[in-house]
Amino acid sequence: MNAVNTSAQSRFHSVEAATENNAVQEQAIAVFRGPHQPATDIAAKVQALETLLTQAASEFDSIALASSLAAEDNVLFDVIARLKLNIRVFSLNTGRLHQQTLDVAPALQAKYGQTVAWFEPQAAAVETYVNTKGRDAFYESTALRKECCGIRKVEPLARALQGAKAWVTGQRQAQAATRAELPLREFDADRGIEKFNP
């Protein structure tokens, strides 16, 4: 398995690691480097990413990065912050995130001076789901998993993207077979806005 895909390396190990001068650059190398790729290929990919995000920010006056605070998203955050792009950054706090994940946002804010906006599920909906189906009911069936995701992810995402004309994700083709054909840019018909998957 590729080192990029391991949980330990896909997130910052600590707040201190997130604030080190080269932490994001090291993540960029980990994200963009495939087996035996020379550094020049990485530089070209970073340049292409910078160009894409710059063009997206100039094309859309209301654009947002949906950040999971994983390595891929932190590379995007770094580019947005360094280039001072008008792309707001948000994350979904599902109520089930690990503390290490939660610690990344303030570290990024401290390093770059750019805020990560948090969107959470409606407390009443979560409470009803947990009380009637159980805290971990999403393990029991596909229907319960989809219901939980609807409450904890889909609805908060809809609020986070309200008013946006485009959004950016950290999804990668290598993450899953279902993402193998993930386009760089697509129209998100569910939300009626453009979507970038750099």
What does each model-identified segment do?
Residues 2-198:
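Nucleotide-activated chemistry modules centered on ATP-dependent adenylation/adenylyltransferase
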